[in-house]
Amino acid sequence: MMNNFSKIGFILAALGSSIGLGHIWRFPYIAGTNGGGAFVLLYLFLALTIGIAMLVGEMLIGNKGKANAFKSYENLDPSPSKKWRYAGLTLIGGPIILSFYAIVLGWVFYYLFMVSFNLPSDMESSGVVFGELYENGFVPQTLGLLFVMGLTGWIISRGVKRGIELLNLILTPLLFIIFFGLLIYAMSMDSFGKAVEFMLSFDMQEAKKAFTLDVFVDSLGQVFFSLSLGVGIIITYAANSDSHQNLLKSSLWIVLSGIAIAIMAGLMIFTFVFEYEGVVNKGAGLIFVTLPVMFSHLGILGNIIAFLFLVAFSFAGITSTISLLEPAVMYMSETYGWSRAKATWSITLAIIALGMVIVCSICTPAADYLAVGGKSLMDIIEFLSANFIMSIGGLLAVIFIGWVVSKEKLESYTAHFFGKLGFNVWYYLMRYITPLITIIILLAKIAEFFMGEDAVKSILESMGL
């Protein structure tokens, strides 16, 4: 079962896991509203330092542990008690995230098949279309969840080589081709320059926004989420990679390619938004409300562009769903001796069950009973998994590499891709800087959870941060 990825297959699979829905619809917005080019530089700096350091660290755990996340920690733990194996249990974050992620991806498929060639022509009607799906669409949301999880389960059940690698060898390059083609078209539009200015300008007054603590924490959180850190994905994929894989080069490819996709998507999206004076917002509102109206102004060409955009978006989503499911499947297969099919479909059914509860919490009369503090169950699970499970998982990984595995072992593990200076920089980051920054993120998110985002921002502003 081990060493099933080819070298390029491993990079594309890890890249596919990182280029998800949130990376495409969230990064452009926070870049444009938090300093533009200055924020992009800040994000690049953090991704190329902290991000790559953590990627290499998690890859090492899997590449040298050669097992599921739980067992990989155990195999590398030098202590007799082997208690660090429990750090691998953060892989539970994958199925939890997938329970709501599959629902959102189901919305993408709904728009792909039902809306892309019948686009709403104004913001009001577009809001009604999405509102009807979100608040009253129990049947389409259920069908979307079943379709996404059925497709994900089928791919995973085929194995690493015939399932995960084959899918990513096809979809990840196609994703780049579609986005690049759409970007070329966007460059011919009058508003392309405005989109470039919105995302990449270096206005010093606006740049100050990128250097406040809350934006710094937000950008670090985006690094975590966009690189699939903390939930066993990277460890699991690396366990199936070649023992002599250049993990530094692989990490660079993943980070830079992810940034390229995010910037291409952002420039393309905001060109259309500015061309037709749409509303600059983020998340579902941008993708499912604003963009359909913008595309509708182009007639049949807009229908084609909308279709291609949603195809690319669905590609990004499905390469992420398989990465969220694989760590748990590998764990159950290796720990309990289950066949790959049994592990895949058992976990898939459990995710569907949780997903159905979430669907009920947003579009049935049960919504009021499943809400906590005015937040839907979907919002709560999304916030907890993205901000706590991933942060805790990432923190455990960096502490394990920086403080548990011996420096001598790490030097031998990384000798084929790190020189002495490179190793010392990486080791210093993993031992001191990255754990401290991860703790700051975790504390900030805990404060936000209990006090609210606005209250935390007010406190930071009063402190001059």
List PLM regions with ranges:
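Membrane-embedded translocation segments of transport machinery
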Residues: 4, 8, 165, 169-318, ...
